Each structure stands twice: as structure tokens, then as C-alpha cells.
């Protein structure tokens, strides 16, 4: 459920600045009497988000695979009844790999952001994009850089099933993007377009980093003490629906033996 809400709120937070600026009387344009868009803002936002592709590629192809190896070894030491020294050694290796690969990905993306910053400004001016939009593109590039790092931090939290932390950072991200951009459109005016998105992302990234750091530094507590002492079956709405449709006996999927029948009491 947390992953679903994260996806919804993250996607909504990304598009909120665009949707809010579409309502601007000076920048918003109506197409065919129905659709709204803001040509200047949408164009530079699209090009700014293209700059995030290198980070996403390096994360999936390189960083995530290297991190997963240490992540797997850490939990193998736990589930295979390794002693404390084994678990602690795997934890230190995992944490070191995580921070090292995260720093490497940020440095790699920063080079491309600088490249887009230097070349993009010239290219946009060459194709006769307005100066205000070109200046906004520079700010949006840094905001998108923060978006990329924020997204990676969210994925790492998902690895550890840190649902509370994941929801916290996503709600903060969504509310800041909505609130600051509404304030920018209603109070600050056109000069704030793009900058409010940058501020929202900077604060969201700082908060997400703090949440991840606090979790990683206390990961043994969350893994061992954060679990319930006795298993309690979570009954969701799908289970309730199955009860109504099939009665007290439903088919369940066993992890090893396939389907079997169990009585729901």
C-alpha cells in the first residue's frame, strides 16, 4: 500500500507545478476550448527532465546491482542464522556500498547537469526561446537533479520496506510542491515559476536524506526490534471480498506447495 501511495503522490507531485501554472492567466493557454497547457513552462520542463536520464540509467545498470549484492548478503546472514559478527560485517559493507554508490551516482549526474546547463542555455536561445524561459531552464535543471536523487532515496527505502519513512517523504514532497507553487502563482507571480519547484525539491531532498540516514544508522533495530513478536495476519479488503464471494473456505497460495485450502476463522 505504501509503495502504491508513493507512486501516486510522487507522480502527482512532479506534475503539480505544471498543472498549477496551467491555471495562470498569463502563461496558461486553452486548446480547442478544453485542454490547458503552458507552452513556455512545459517545453523547458520537458528538456530539463531529459537531463535526469543518465542518473536513472547508472542507477539501474550499476548502482542498484552493486548495492543489491551487499543487501542480499546482509539478509542472508540474518536468515541463515549467522552470528553477530557476520551480520555486523555484512551491515557495514552494505552501508559503505550504499553511500559510496549513491555519491558516485550524484557526481556522475552532476556532470551531465552542468553539461545541460552550458549547452542547453545556448541551444534554447538559438531556437528563439524567450529569455525568461531560458533562465527558468537553468533553475529547473537543478530542481530535476534533486528529483533524481530523491527518487533513488525512495527506491532504497522501498528495499528495506520502510513504509512510514517512505510515506513521510512523499507526503512532504507532494505538499511542498503544491503549496509553494500555488503561493508562487497567486502571490509572487511569473518571476517565481520554476524557483518554487526548486525550493520544494531542495527541502524534500533534505528531509528524505535525513529519513534514510536515520533508518540506515539504526537498521539493526528496525530489522530485529521493529517486527512484531507474534505474527498477526493482516486482513485486507481483498480478503474480505474473497470471504463474501467464496465463503469461509478460500484457496490460498502456499509458498512451496502451491494451492491449498485453509479455513478463515
Where are these regions (language model features)?
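Transmembrane helical elements of multi-pass membrane transporters/channels
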Residues: 1-64
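Hydrophobic faces of transmembrane alpha-helices in multi-pass small-molecule transporters and flippases
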Residues: 1-16, 98, 102-107, 111, ...
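Hydrophobic alpha-helical transmembrane segments in multi-pass integral membrane proteins
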Residues: 9-20, 176-189, 238-248
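Extracellular/periplasmic helix-loop-helix junctions in multi-pass membrane proteins
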Residues: 29-38, 124-133, 160, 166-168, ...
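Specific pore-lining/lateral-gate transmembrane helices of multi-pass inner-membrane transport
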Residues: 42-124
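Short runs within selected transmembrane alpha-helices of multi-pass transporters and secretion channels
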Residues: 113-118, 135-160, 166-177, 193-209
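Alpha-helical transmembrane segments
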Residues: 127-131, 149-165, 213-223
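C-terminal transmembrane helix end/exit motif
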Residues: 183-187, 198-257, 262-264
Amino acid at each position: 500500500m505504501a509503495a502504491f501511495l508513493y507512486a501516486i503522490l510522487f507522480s502527482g507531485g512532479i506534475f503539480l507545478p505544471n498543472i498549477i501554472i496551467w491555471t495562470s492567466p498569463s502563461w496558461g493557454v486553452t486548446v480547442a476550448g478544453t485542454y490547458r497547457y503552458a507552452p513556455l513552462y512545459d517545453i523547458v520542463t520537458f528538456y530539463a527532465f531529459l537531463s535526469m536520464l543518465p542518473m536513472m540509467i547508472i542507477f539501474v545498470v550499476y548502482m542498484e546491482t552493486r548495492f543489491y549484492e551487499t543487501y542480499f548478503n546482509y539478509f542472508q546472514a540474518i536468515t541463515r542464522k549467522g552470528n553477530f559478527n557476520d551480520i555486523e560485517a555484512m551491515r557495514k559493507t552494505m552501508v559503505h556500498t550504499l553511500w559510496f554508490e549513491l555519491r558516485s551516482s550524484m557526481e556522475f549526474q552532476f556532470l551531465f547537469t552542468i553539461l545541460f546547463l552550458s549547452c542547453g542555455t545556448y541551444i534554447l536561445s538559438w531556437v528563439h526561446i524567450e529569455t525568461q524561459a531560458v533562465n527558468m531552464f537553468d533553475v529547473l535543471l537543478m530542481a530535476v537533479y534533486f528529483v533524481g536523487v530523491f527518487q533513488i532515496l525512495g527506491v532504497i527505502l522501498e528495499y528495506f520496506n520502510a513504509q512510514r519513512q517512505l510515506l513521510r517523504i512523499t507526503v512532504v514532497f507532494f505538499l511542498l510542491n503544491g503549496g509553494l507553487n500555488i503561493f508562487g502563482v497567486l502571490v509572487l507571480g511569473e518571476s517565481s515559476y520554476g524557483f518554487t519547484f526548486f525550493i520544494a525539491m531542495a527541502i524534500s531532498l533534505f528531509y528524505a536524506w535525513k529519513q534514510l540516514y536515520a533508518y540506515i544508522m539504526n537498521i539493526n533495530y528496525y530489522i530485529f526490534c521493529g517486527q512484531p513478536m507474534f505474527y498477526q495476519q493482516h486482513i485486507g479488503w481483498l480478503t474480505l471480498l474473497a470471504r463474501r464471494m467464496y465463503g469461509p473456505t478460500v484457496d490460498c497460495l502456499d509458498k512451496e506447495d502451491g494451492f491449498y485450502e485453509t479455513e478463515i476463522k
